[in-house]
Regions:
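Peripheral interaction segments used for macromolecular assembly
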Residues: 1-115
Length: 115
């Protein structure tokens, strides 16, 4: 697979589905957060699907937890549906503010030590 085959426009990412490894739908990408210094995607804000979507909260996931599934054209998150439900959730205004330190909270939750 060439580099060109792996590139995706940012507008294409918005709305893409995210499943867990078992194929359960977790939600859809609503925002992508780019590290302005490194020039890479760090997080996606996922709008949960189904019954636990109530409340209008988004769950940010570290990009490194995602793997692209060519067959189903979805991202697969390296976590269970239950773990996703437990992940920190924020409204859109909170995600747009540095006041909440949401990235640090997300890193701590997923225990990745990447901040």
């Amino acid at each position: 697979m060439s580099l060109d085959d792996r590139l995706m426009k940012s507008a294409t990412l918005i709305g893409l589905k995210i499943n867990d490894a078992g194929g359960h739908k977790l939600g859809a990408i609503r925002e992508v957060f780019i590290d302005r210094d490194a020039g890479i995607a760090r997080y996606v804000a996922v709008e949960p699907a189904g019954l636990f979507a109530a409340g209008g909260k988004y769950r940010p996931l570290p990009w490194r937890l995602l793997t692209w599934d060519d067959k189903d054209e979805v991202y697969v998150a390296d976590l269970t549906k239950d773990r996703f439900k437990e992940a920190p959730a924020y409204d859109r205004d909170q995600l747009g503010s540095t006041t909440y330190a949401w990235a640090e909270q997300v890193e701590k939750f997923f225990d990745t030590g990447q901040v």
